[in-house]
């Protein structure tokens, strides 16, 4: 799918490749269950392969092999790389979430637990990630709220709940959500700028 998007949406790869900004893609190692943070320009493979791995959904995607290791979506082990950024010593951290403030994930039902077990029983460390991801996400959201209230980080979140699923196929609904995100993102610019300048 990523290759299809690259054909349809113009992207200035030259500027991206040679720009001075550090860019990372987070993917989960299916063998170890641990997140890997791939930095643009510092891998032995094309960075877009790391991006592809970081967006490869479990259950729906074949793992992407990087340096001989299988990887899936970074969110399986690291929903938001907040603690990584704090540990790296970043002084200013802007977090953009896909859910509104106060959103918390429900724990998976038995059918989902069984499905994860069917797919990943031979990968016990990754399976453990899948079975605890909601709990880790919710704990991280509590931490985000605290750090935001203390002014340590800046969060940009949807103003209203997202009402479509991750496999939505209705192009009109997707376009409406895109336009909403674009509008709300522009509205948040003053907030972000103010945070970065303090």
Task: Give, region by region, the residue ranges found by the protein language model.
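Patatin-like phospholipase
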Residues: 1-198
